[in-house]
Amino acid sequence: MTTKKTSSVVLPLLLVFALILMPMVAGQLKSTCRIAEAWKGAKECNAKCAALGTTRGGVCQKFLGDLYCCCWD
């Protein structure tokens, strides 16, 4: 009896949770990342992204020991 009650409550809650998360995941910004050996920080990365024509700038990220400059598309 308790299992039926619990499952009848949990399933609708999971559906509502999924409906809330779907727009969040779908609306994420896409970025193009390039290896940033020459860049030393965020200012250089933002300048490079501005030169490439992006309006939102960029961010430096370290991944597997390399520094990447990611420009928002």
Curated annotation (Swiss-Prot):
It comes from the Eukaryota. Residues 1-27 form the signal peptide. InterPro entries: DEFL. GO terms for cellular component: extracellular region. Keywords: Antimicrobial, Disulfide bond, Fungicide, Plant defense, Secreted, Signal. The keyword Acetylation does not apply. Disulfide bonds join 33-71, 45-69, 49-70. It is found in: Secreted. Its main location: secreted. GO terms for biological process: defense response to fungus; killing of cells of another organism. Belongs to the DEFL family. This is Defensin-like protein 87. The lineage of its organism: Eukaryota, Viridiplantae, Streptophyta, Embryophyta, Tracheophyta.
